Amino acid sequence: MKPQPFTLELSNCQLRHDGGAADKDEVRMVNVRWIDGFMVNSVSNENAGYLANTRADGASHIFLALSTNDNNTLNKSNKIVPADPQQNRVPLVEKAVDGGIFTYYIGYVTPAPEKATSGPLTSWATWELVYN
């Protein structure tokens, strides 16, 4: 996997509580939950969460995988499986004024490199913002 970073950026939102002095510096519960995607039919835990190609005329035997870091090795500590209630999360990095950034990674994976073919690769994944 050769992961590339992408970000989800929040703006114009208050991340710190504005209540009493005791909780003024507490960061609100803000996180991203991946809830769906065009995933391969999982036959093992290894390929759970892989995003399949939506193009019939595109690359074959190659998938996309979401992860929490830029490691070239994808494993249970960094792989994101959409809709998994125990999915790995990334921390919110606060911006100086009213906002924050979540940084994720996406890369190509293949369980059978000898069968992989080149071509366009398109897929999708859906996320939701949880803000308490």
Curated annotation (Swiss-Prot):
Coiled coil: none annotated. The keyword Transcription regulation does not apply. InterPro entries: Adhesion_dom_fimbrial_sf (IPR036937), Adhesion_dom_sf (IPR008966). One of its GO terms (biological process) is cell adhesion. Gene3D superfamilies: Fimbrial-type adhesion domain. It is found in: Fimbrium. Keywords: Fimbrium. It comes from the Bacteria. One of its GO terms (cellular component) is pilus. Appears to affect the stability of the intact fimbriae on the cell surface. This is Protein MrkF. It comes from Klebsiella pneumoniae.
